[in-house]
Swiss-Prot record:
The keyword Ribosomal protein applies. The gene is rpmG. This is Large ribosomal subunit protein bL33. SUPFAM superfamilies: Zn-binding ribosomal proteins. Gene3D superfamilies: Ribosomal protein L33. It holds the Pfam family Ribosomal_L33.
Length: 55
């Protein structure tokens, strides 16, 4: 069995509220940084979430 290509990443809010989502992505096919527009409940609006490493 080989090593899994799926890694966990942290999506951090660009509104700098400290809110984040944890999700998975395929490390082999999606090599760039992920940017997703999602809801930030602290800011109470949709903002861009950018990929960051899980500490």
């Amino acid at each position: 069995m080989g090593k899994s290509n799926v890694i966990q990443i942290r999506l951090v809010s660009s509104a700098e509220t400290g809110y984040f989502y944890v999700t998975k992505k395929n490390a082999r096919s999606a090599t760039g940084k992920m940017e997703v527009r999602k809801y930030d409940p602290v800011a109470r609006k949709h903002v861009v979430f950018r990929e960051a490493k899980i500490k």
